[in-house]
Design a protein with these regions (language model features):
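Conserved catalytic/coupling modules of large nucleotide/cofactor-utilizing molecular machines
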Residues: 213-216, 230, 237-484
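N-terminal accessory targeting/assembly segments
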Residues: 1-108, 112-117
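The conserved Walker
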Residues: 175
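Phosphate-interacting basic helix/loop segments used at nucleotide- and nucleic-acid interfaces
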Residues: 13-24, 153-157, 207, 262, ...
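P-loop NTPase nucleotide-binding/switch module
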Residues: 88-90, 97, 101-104, 117-168, ...
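Residue-level signature of catalytic and energy-coupling elements of molecular machines
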Residues: 33, 87, 109, 163, ...
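Phosphate-binding/switch loop-helix module in NTP-utilizing enzymes
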Residues: 160, 200-235, 286-288
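Active-site phosphate-binding and catalytic loops of NTP-dependent enzymes
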Residues: 18-27, 97-101, 116-123, 141-147, ...
Length: 484
């Protein structure tokens, strides 16, 4: 028997078996849950955990590190607390909180983790970029001035409070005044009131990260934060549970920094490719793939209480943004929609974000409307007035009617210029007040069918003498039908 067994054969078999053994070992840094309550957990044992790092619990729930303390780590849960108990293990992922993004996100509804919640199935993440939720804003060198208009299709906004690409324009007002209706976009990062506070807190950051993915690849993106008041409340809730020091109205001391670092990420990137490629705090996945000239425009929304714009969070965001659109309950109830208070609404970018034809036509519209409001207030105390005052009031009331616009019915900029020219220059003075909107619709129908070339010229920014003559003739024909 011993003659049949050869040492060389035994060694070959042993070597073959040893080769099949996987000698590589994976070490995970694991901690233990000390306490869990109200969407916040404290973990013992993760000494090397980093701020904003993702942690994974036994049941697959993810969490983000927010507090680094002497003997434990405080983290916020990105899922339900059910199933998480004291003594369970938690491991580090060695990944800073991020979201995987690609072009397949267009037209989808996702949560702050990038998971689809619109019932249309999972999103194909082939070739996705890992975009950090929290990222430093581009430095001044990598930006360029806001000079390209972002057409909203709303006459009141495009004419008097123009928004440019790369701008941050606040939409502020009480509940139910039409704030969301002004700004609606396609990719929605949703965290509802029923979601954990951490999901509500991180939803705007996820939206900014998706916007930056498109901006840094040379596209123009728009992000709408609806609304930052709720995010501040969610941040306050999380911070108080983590026992962070509280300040005014029990908000944490860094609530201003929370909103400023989020909104400063909106920018128009420098057109020069070599400059854009050197952008600060660029994620690894974007290095070598950045294209200049992209923009990220932010429209944050803030809900006020009884029109109080001097409260803590509203004043913070007003001071950060490049202007605000203030919506008033009284105007909304009177039927003026969008219910924009022209007097205290402003765009600090101004005419540089308007095409030339709109700038020429609407240059005095805001002042005219402010003077009309003042005159209207005084006219209530006086029965007789001179002809000039009566004409100013009539023109102002008709312009008010022209600026009213049905919900989700944007108007092309060429048509806006044409109808606003008629209003500003008093071409509708013979039209009865209750027929102004009918006259507007008939005028625009005539322009579309007979003078489409003029509308195109106006949209290109050219207000020529020929265009003005066509506008005057068309309005004269239409207005003549409404003479009393």
């Amino acid at each position: 028997m011993s003659d049949k067994i050869k040492p060389s054969e035994v060694s070959e078999v042993l070597q073959q078996q040893l080769q099949e053994v996987n000698g590589s070992q994976q070490f995970d840094e694991v901690g233990t849950v000390l306490t869990v309550s109200d969407g916040v957990a404290r973990i013992y044992g993760l000494r090397n955990a980093e701020a904003n790092e993702l942690l994974e619990f036994e049941n697959g729930t993810m969490a983000i590190v927010m507090n680094l303390e002497e003997d434990n780590v405080g983290c916020v849960l990105l899922g339900p607390t059910a199933g998480i108990k004291e003594g369970q293990s938690v491991k580090r992922t060695h990944r800073i909180a991020s979201i995987r993004v690609n072009d397949n996100f267009l037209g989808r509804v996702v949560n702050p983790l990038g998971q689809a919640i619109d019932g249309l199935g999972d999103i194909d993440l082939t070739g996705a970029f890992e975009m950090p939720l929290d990222r430093k804003a581009p430095g001044v060198i990598y930006r360029q001035p806001v000079k390209e208009p972002l057409q909203t299709g709303l006459k009141a906004v495009d004419s008097m409070i123009p928004i440019g690409r790369g701008q941050r324009e606040l939409i502020i007002g009480d509940r139910q005044t039409g704030k969301t209706a002004i700004a609606v976009d396609t990719i929605i990062v949703s965290a509802t009131a029923a979601d954990p506070a951490a999901m509500q807190y991180y939803a705007p950051f996820a939206g900014a990260a998706i916007g930056e993915y498109f901006r840094d690849r040379g596209y123009s993106a728009l992000v709408v934060y609806d609304d930052l008041s709720k995010q501040a409340v969610a941040y306050r809730e999380v911070s108080l549970i983590l026992r962070r020091p509280s300040g005014r109205e029990a908000y944490p001391g860094d609530v201003f920094y929370l909103h400023s670092r989020l909104l400063e990420r909106a920018a128009r990137i420098n057109d020069q490719q070599e400059v854009a490629e050197q952008m600060n705090d660029l994620p690894e996945c974007l290095k070598g793939k950045v294209k200049g000239g992209g923009s990220l425009t932010a429209l944050p929304i803030i809900e006020t209480q009884a029109g109080d714009v001097s409260a803590y969070i509203p004043t913070n965001v007003i001071s950060i943004t490049d202007g605000q659109i203030f919506l008033e309950t009284d105007l909304f109830n009177q039927g003026f929609r969008p219910a924009i208070n022209v007097g205290i609404s402003v765009s600090r970018v101004g005419g540089s974000a308007q095409i030339k034809s709109m700038k020429k036509v609407a240059g005095t519209l805001k002042i005219d409307m402010a003077q009309y409001r003042e005159l209207e207030a005084f006219s209530k105390f006086s029965s007789d007035m001179d002809a000039v005052t009566a004409m100013t009031l009539d023109r102002g009331r008709k312009n008010d009617q022209l600026l009213v616009q049905p919900q989700y019915r944007p108007m092309p900029v060429g048509e806006q210029v044409a109808i606003l020219y008629c209003g500003v220059h008093g071409l509708m003075h013979d039209v009865p007040m209750d027929k102004v909107r009918d006259c507007q619709d008939q005028f625009l129908d005539a322009m579309r069918s007979q003078h489409a070339d003029v509308i195109e010229t106006l949209a290109d920014g050219k207000l020529t003498d020929d265009c003005i003559a066509v506008i005057k003739d068309t309005m004269a024909n239409v207005a003549g039908q409404y003479k009393a």
